[in-house]
């Protein structure tokens, strides 16, 4: 009888222990669930407003070279001006030679012989081996420590995928994806050998949040996001930092927005935020080798990702409605313009 009592005693003690463990587990889970959004909020605010980014010089000293694609206008031009001000020589690549010459002349007049510039007119949509061979000749022997993958193309107006012109689809993929791959692959061996370097690739909310009526563009930018996260892990052991830079709307020719606001910075404001937050995630929390550095874009991405989910049906539906409206207005404008002619 005593042995049975002892046995039952052990069982009762064991049961009590299991109950206590379960209670503690539920309590800890509750505390974690309550604390997680608070911690996440603190993290995003610190990253966007308080903590500084890494210094550019940690990726390559002044006097080394920065290569910028899509350099003649908008964001690319502002990157060129900002990097020249910080003492970096420039390789400017874009489609129109006259615009490149004008930018190079502006930089030369401001900084004189302290900053060297090289230019190459190149239509990335053509994907010509001869163009990439010319680019390779241009950079051979140069210490290129910074690469800004900025060249990009979107649809002329929002358009259903079934109606997207074949040439437009091809150009978007060639410019956004293939050009970025080929230029990066051309420069990474040198960065690896020098054990330092910075690769910034301009992405878009259109790739982070699925965007109906911009399906090809959205897919191309989603590709850049996945590729950057994978490439960043590959190059990190070699001292090369990769950062996919996410953004919402900016006052550029691509967005067709002219007036800046709190939600829509101009290129200069966006570039300043990007270079001041190198290595910081901003609103792109828990996304490897990715940053959303501009404050309003960062808060927007963080909120949507945390509380709705970047690929949730609600977000996709909102995106579709917004771009259907943009398409209707664009078509009406085209009709009015046609009647005036």
Swiss-Prot record:
Pathway connected to this protein: Lipid metabolism; fatty acid biosynthesis
Molecular function (Gene Ontology), one example: very-long-chain 3-oxoacyl-CoA reductase activity
Protein topology in the membrane: Single-pass membrane protein
Pfam families: adh_short
PROSITE patterns with a match to the protein in the record: ADH_SHORT
Keyword Lipid biosynthesis: yes
Reaction catalysed by this enzyme: a very-long-chain (3R)-3-hydroxyacyl-CoA + NADP(+) = a very-long-chain 3-oxoacyl-CoA + NADPH + H(+)
GO CC annotations, alphabetized: endoplasmic reticulum; endoplasmic reticulum membrane
Top-tier EC class: oxidoreductase
One annotated GO biological process: sphingolipid biosynthetic process
Active-site annotation: 217 (proton donor), 221 (lowers pka of active site tyr)
UniProt KW keywords: Endoplasmic reticulum, Fatty acid biosynthesis, Fatty acid metabolism, Lipid biosynthesis, Lipid metabolism, Membrane, NADP, Oxidoreductase, Transmembrane, Transmembrane helix
SUPFAM superfamilies tied to this protein: NAD(P)-binding Rossmann-fold domains
Enzyme Commission number(s) from the entry: 1.1.1.330
Residues spanning the membrane: 22-42
Binding site for NADP(+): 67, 123, 131, 150, 217, 221, 250, 252
Domain of life where this protein originates: Eukaryota
Location of this chain's protein in the cell: Endoplasmic reticulum membrane
HAMAP family, sorted: 3_ketoreductase (MF_03107)
Function: Component of the microsomal membrane bound fatty acid elongation system, which produces the 26-carbon very long-chain fatty acids (VLCFA) from palmitate. Catalyzes the reduction of the 3-ketoacyl-CoA intermediate that is formed in each cycle of fatty acid elongation. VLCFAs serve as precursors for ceramide and sphingolipids.
Family: Belongs to the short-chain dehydrogenases/reductases (SDR) family.
Protein name according to UniProt: Very-long-chain 3-oxoacyl-CoA reductase
Lineage of the organism: Eukaryota, Fungi, Dikarya, Ascomycota, Pezizomycotina
């Amino acid at each position: 009888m005593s042995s049975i009592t002892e046995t039952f005693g052990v069982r009762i003690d064991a049961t009590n222990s299991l109950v206590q463990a379960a209670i503690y587990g539920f309590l800890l889970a509750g505390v974690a669930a309550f604390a997680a959004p608070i911690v996440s909020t603190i993290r995003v605010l610190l990253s966007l407003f308080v903590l500084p980014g890494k210094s550019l010089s940690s990726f390559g000293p002044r006097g080394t070279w920065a290569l910028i694609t899509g350099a003649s206008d908008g964001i690319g031009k502002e990157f060129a001006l900002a990097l020249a001000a910080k003492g970096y020589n420039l390789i400017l690549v874009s489609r129109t030679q006259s615009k490149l010459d004008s930018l190079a002349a502006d930089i030369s007049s401001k900084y004189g012989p302290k900053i060297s510039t090289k230019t190459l007119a190149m239509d990335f949509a053509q994907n010509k081996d001869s163009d990439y061979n010319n680019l390779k000749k241009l950079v051979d022997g140069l210490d290129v420590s910074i690469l800004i993958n900025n060249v990009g193309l979107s649809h002329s107006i929002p358009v259903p995928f079934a109606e997207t012109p074949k040439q437009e689809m091809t150009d978007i993929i060639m410019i956004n994806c293939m050009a970025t791959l080929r230029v990066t692959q051309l420069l990474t061996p040198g960065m690896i050998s020098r054990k330092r370097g910075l690769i910034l690739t301009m992405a878009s909310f259109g790739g982070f949040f699925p965007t109906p009526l911009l399906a090809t563009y959205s897919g191309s930018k989603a590709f850049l996001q996945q590729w950057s996260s994978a490439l960043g892990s590959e190059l990190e052991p070699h001292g090369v930092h990769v950062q996919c830079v996410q953004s919402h709307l900016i006052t550029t020719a691509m967005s067709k927005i002219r007036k800046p606001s709190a939600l829509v910075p101009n290129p200069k404001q966006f570039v300043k935020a990007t270079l001041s937050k190198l290595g910081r995630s901003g609103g792109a929390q828990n996304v490897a080798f990715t940053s959303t550095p501009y404050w309003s874009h960062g808060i927007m991405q963080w909120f949507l990702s945390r509380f709705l989910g970047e690929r949730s049906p609600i977000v996709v539906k909102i995106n579709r409605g917004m771009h259907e409206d943009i398409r209707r207005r664009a078509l009406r404008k085209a009709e009015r313009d046609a009647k005036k002619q």
